[in-house]
Amino acid sequence: MKTAHEIRPGNVIMLDGSPWVVQKTETTRSGRNAAIVKLKLKNLLLNSGTETTFKGEDKLEDIILDRLDCTYSYFADPMFVFMDAEYNQYDVEAENLGDAAAYIVDGMEETCQVTFYDGKAISVEMPTTIVREVIYTEPSARGDTSGKVMKPATITGGGTVTVADFVKVGDKIEIDTRTGEFKKRV
């Protein structure tokens, strides 16, 4: 058990019978009152989010989930199948992947972290950055160079990313999977 003000982003807490990962914490202290801790949480079973508030001294049950490095194997509707180094396969429901599903492609070489709760694979964490090919984007607009010009691009896997104007079809780009932002052309 930890007090609310000891909880940090990345911790997993048990709340209302479900595991929640802490995405953001904000502590507010006022003169005579005790600290108030505001937590932004994501439910690992339902892939939904919420914000909630606790008193600083409230006790929260922190849990440690098993995580395993795996590679993407194949898609069997509605499951994404991942494989570990010992060739064990783990099914993760497509709805539990959230935004990560747009970055998963056949033949990807990046290693993902599969999270387990009660022996069941419940979520997948992508690497911080990945490289994908642009399969569609509009041509750059000539003369439109005032400031930072951005445009939408479709990448392998079907996701859409806002890229710099100089990026064209066939370019490989680096993407931050936490924010979905274009980092650079590779």
Swiss-Prot record:
Main subcellular location: cytoplasm
InterPro entries to which the protein is assigned, alphabetical: Elong-fact-P_C, NA-bd_OB-fold, Rib_uL2_dom2, Transl_elong_fac_P/YeiP, Transl_elong_KOW-like, Transl_elong_P/YeiP_cen, Transl_elongation_fac_P, Translation_prot_SH3-like_sf
Entry's Gene Ontology cellular component terms: cytoplasm
Gene field: efp
Record-given protein name: Elongation factor P
Function: Involved in peptide bond synthesis. Stimulates efficient translation and peptide-bond synthesis on native or reconstituted 70S ribosomes in vitro. Probably functions indirectly by altering the affinity of the ribosome for aminoacyl-tRNA, thus increasing their reactivity as acceptors for peptidyl transferase.
Keywords: Cytoplasm, Elongation factor, Protein biosynthesis
Family according to the record: Belongs to the elongation factor P family.
One of the record's GO molecular function terms: translation elongation factor activity
Subcellular location: Cytoplasm
One biological process term in Gene Ontology: peptide biosynthetic process
Pfam families: EFP, EFP_N, Elong-fact-P_C
Pathway where it operates: Protein biosynthesis; polypeptide chain elongation
